[in-house]
Amino acid sequence: MNRKNHLLTAILFAFALPATAAAQAPVNDVTAPLHLMKPDYPTPYGAPSVADVSKVLDRVFTYLDAVTPAKVIDKNTRQEIRDFSKLDDNAVFAQGDYRLTSYEWGVTYAGMLAAGAATGEQRYIDYTNKRVTLLAELAKPTLARLKANPNAQSPILRTLRPHALDDIGALCAAFVKARRNGLQADVGPLLDSCRTFIGSKEHRLADGTLARLRPQPDTLWLDDMFMGVPAWAQLGKLTGERKYFDESVKQILQFSQRMFNPQKGIYMHGWVQGMDVHPEFHWARANGWAVMTLVEVLDVLPEDHPGREAVLKQLRAHVKGLASYQDGTGFWHQLLDRPDSYLETSATAIYAYSMARAINKGYIDRAAYAPAVMLAWNAVATKVNAKGQVEGTCVGTGMGFDPAFYYYRPINVFAAHGYGPVLLAGAEVINLLKTQKFEINDSSVQLVTRK
C-alpha cells in the first residue's frame, strides 16, 4: 500500500511541476533586485558582535593557560622548585607547548593585558602577571649566581644575557606595560638587561641603525623595528626621559628611509649595506612588525615631540599600502604583492590589530579602513580552532633573497607568532565595536559616520 501511495505522489508531482514553474515569475533584471542577492563569501561578512569576538579570545586563553605552566622544576627529579635561593643548573621551566621567554611570548603577554582591558576579565591580566612575576623573581638570584659563576645556567639566562634583540625587546615592552598596568613584581633587573643590550651591545650601522651580522654583514631586518623600538619607547614612557623617544623616532625614520617602498606602500624584509641592489621581498609578518611599531610608538610618543608628525605620516602611508593588498578572503598573503603565495594568519592578525588601534586612536581615517578591519578579524577568527589553537601561521623565518624561501615556509599551530597578535586584534576590535556603529548599506559593510 505504501509503495502505491509513493508512486501516485510521484506521478502527481511530475504533472504539477511544469504548471508550478510556469506560475512563478522569471528572475531577471525586471522582476528581482539582483544587487541584493546574497554573495557567496568565503569568509563571514559583516561586523561581528562583541560577544562573538570574546568567544574567540576565550578559546585562545583557555588553551594557552593550560599549556604554558608557570613554574620551575628540577630537570632530574621533576619536582617543583619554590625556593629560588636554592637554584642550581638543574632548574628549568616546567615543559609546556610554548617558551615563556621568547619574543613571541612578549607579544602574547601584551595581548593578554589588552584582552583583559577590553573585556574587563581579570584572568587575562593575571595570566601575564603570574608569568612575568615568575621571571622577575628568578632575576636577582640568577644574577647572583652569574656573578659567582659566569657559566651558571638558568631558565632566564638569555633574558638576562641576551644574544640578540629577539631575546629581550618584545619581552621588555611587555614588562613595562605590565608594570604600568599595576604589576607589583620588581622587573627592574629585567629592564636593566634590556637597556644595556639595546643601548650599547646590539650591532648598529655607522648612523646608529639597529643591524645584524647575518645573513650578511650589516643587514637591516625589518623585524628589528619591533624587536628594538617599542621597548625603547615604553622605557621613555616609564621614565619620562626624552632620549628614549628621540632614539625611537630616529630608528623608525632610518629603517623607513632604506626599506620602505613609497610606490607600493610596503617594506622590504631585508636590506644589506654591502649590496649594490636591494632585492625586495615584502614578507607579510615583517610588515606587521613594522606597522605595529609605528602604532605602539605613537601611543606613547609625546604630542609635542618634533618627530611625531613624521611617524604619523609613515603610519598612514604604510596602512594605505597594506590595505591595497588585502585578499578578498580578508587575509593577506605571505608575500604581500604576490597573490600566488599562501594566505597567512599571524600577519593578518597584526594588521587587524594595528589598523583597529590606529582607528581607535584617531591616527587614520575610520570610515576608510574600518571595513577592512572587520573583514580581517572575521578571517582570523576562522583560523582559531575549537581547541583554541591558531592555524595558518608561518613558522619562524630568517631572511632570503629568493621567492622560494618565503613561498614554502611551513605553517604550524605551534608557531608561537600567531597567539599574541590574535589576542591584540580581538581586544582592539572589541574596543572598536564598543565605540563605533556599523551597518550593511547596499550589501556592503560601512562604518556609520552620520550623527
Q: Where are the model-predicted features located?
A:
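Bacterial N-terminal signal peptides that target proteins for export
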Residues: 1-9
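Boundary at the C-terminal end of the N-terminal hydrophobic targeting segment
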Residues: 21-23
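Extended ligand-binding clefts on enzyme/binding-domain cores
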Residues: 189, 219-334, 341-352, 364-402, ...
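Extended ligand-binding groove/face enriched in aromatic
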Residues: 125-129, 136-271, 278-280, 387
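Bacterial N-terminal signal peptides
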Residues: 9-19
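CBM-like carbohydrate-recognition segments
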Residues: 25-103, 118, 122-125, 130, ...
